[in-house]
Curated annotation (Swiss-Prot):
The gene is aflJ. A motif (Involved in the stabilization of the negatively charged intermediate by the formation of the oxyanion hole) lies at residues 85-87. The active site is at 154, 255, 285. This is Versiconal hemiacetal acetate esterase. Versiconal hemiacetal acetate esterase; part of the gene cluster that mediates the biosynthesis of aflatoxins, a group of polyketide-derived furanocoumarins, and part of the most toxic and carcinogenic compounds among the known mycotoxins. The four major aflatoxins produced by A.parasiticus are aflatoxin B1 (AFB1), aflatoxin B2 (AFB2), aflatoxin G1 (AFG1) and aflatoxin G2 (AFG2). Within the aflatoxin pathway, the versiconal hemiacetal acetate esterase aflJ converts versiconal hemiacetal acetate (VHA) into versiconal (VAL). Its EC number is 3.1.1.94. The keyword tRNA-binding does not apply. Belongs to the 'GDXG' lipolytic enzyme family.
């Protein structure tokens, strides 16, 4: 039987002996499943050591904390990014994506601030979004009012869009130089406009092919408690997308969120927003973060696309 996976991902799945896929029964089972998977990856493959050439500083800010990254040989003229980690608004954190942020800071030659936003279900919407806005304003003051590249993965990509749009709606569009959204959530499945529903099939097609299964995504939305049609969560519906300066989106072809990326690109194109877009057929959600040797070229290509986008926005 022909595999839907790209060759390098297929090699990883064969070696691992399973397709990484979170159970979706409830939040406890998701957290347990993710913990087990992360432990297996660490034991069998190991995660690369952090890049110590990138300097870090932790900052406490009104109940949340931030980690600031500065690449080697920084001059103070580098672009500034604000990064939101993934995890369906309920898990993950700055520490979990520290290595990834160090790579972004070095490869993109940018000063980066990673946000430890509050998680659901303990803090429901709009807690994480409010934290994003607070972090953006803090980063602005720290880095001489330099416009920010708002960046994020998965739910973090959603927060990057939401924070940018909230700033725009608060007459602070000048604080945003662009959005870098990696496999982002852009719309609640129940909020997809009727005329676009035929194009929104990834939740069915990729339900069990990716770490963020269809069932897990439902749990994430249920925990976050954002209204289905809220325009800072279902950002596809926001009436002022045309105010976004520049946007980069990375799509993973076997992701439940594949069509979130595609529909957002279509909406941005209609609004005549400058867009860079990279698609990776045959790869599932966050494939660029998994530590397996066959995925090295995929990871380098993926990060190269991110770096190119940051240069374009700077």
């Amino acid at each position: 039987m022909e595999t839907p996976f790209a060759g390098p991902w297929h090699q990883f799945v064969e070696d691992l002996g399973q397709t990484p896929c979170l159970p979706g029964k409830d939040l406890d089972s998701i957290l347990a499943g993710w913990g087990q998977l992360a432990g297996t990856l660490a034991t069998r493959y190991g995660f690369p050591p952090p890049d110590e050439s990138v300097a870090t500083e932790d900052v406490q800010l009104d109940g949340l904390w931030l980690r600031c990254y500065t690449p080697a040989n920084a001059t103070g003229q580098e672009p500034v990014g604000l990064y939101f980690h993934g995890g369906g608004w309920v898990m993950g954190g700055v520490k979990e994506e520290d290595g990834f942020c160090r790579v972004i800071s070095r490869q993109c030659q940018m000063r980066l601030v990673s946000v430890e936003y509050r998680k659901a279900p303990e803090t429901r919407y709009p807690g994480a979004l409010n934290d994003g806005v607070s972090a953006a304003l803090w980063a602005q003051s720290r880095y001489e009012n330099q416009p920010l590249v708002l960046m994020g993965t998965s739910a973090g990509g959603n927060l990057a869009f939401g924070t940018a749009l909230r700033l725009i709606d608060q007459d602070m569009a000048d604080k945003v130089s662009g959005v870098v959204a990696l496999a982002p959530i852009t719309v609640h499945p129940d909020a997809v406009p009727e005329h676009l529903k035929e194009q929104y099939t990834a939740y069915e097609e990729n339900a069990e092919l990716t770490v963020n299964s269809r069932a897990a995504m439902q749990v994430f939305f249920d925990c976050y408690k954002a209204p289905v049609d809220d325009v800072y969560t279902s950002c596809l519906l926001h009436p002022r997308l045309l105010a976004l300066p520049k946007v980069y989106i990375a799509e993973l072809g076997l992701d439940t969120l594949r069509d979130d990326a595609r529909l957002m690109k279509g909406a941005l194109d209609t609004a005549k927003v400058p867009v860079m877009y990279d698609a990776y057929p045959g790869y599932p959600h966050c494939s660029f973060m998994f530590p397996f040797k066959s995925l090295g070229e995929h990871q380098r290509t993926f990060l190269g696309g991110v770096a190119k986008a940051v240069r374009w926005m700077s």
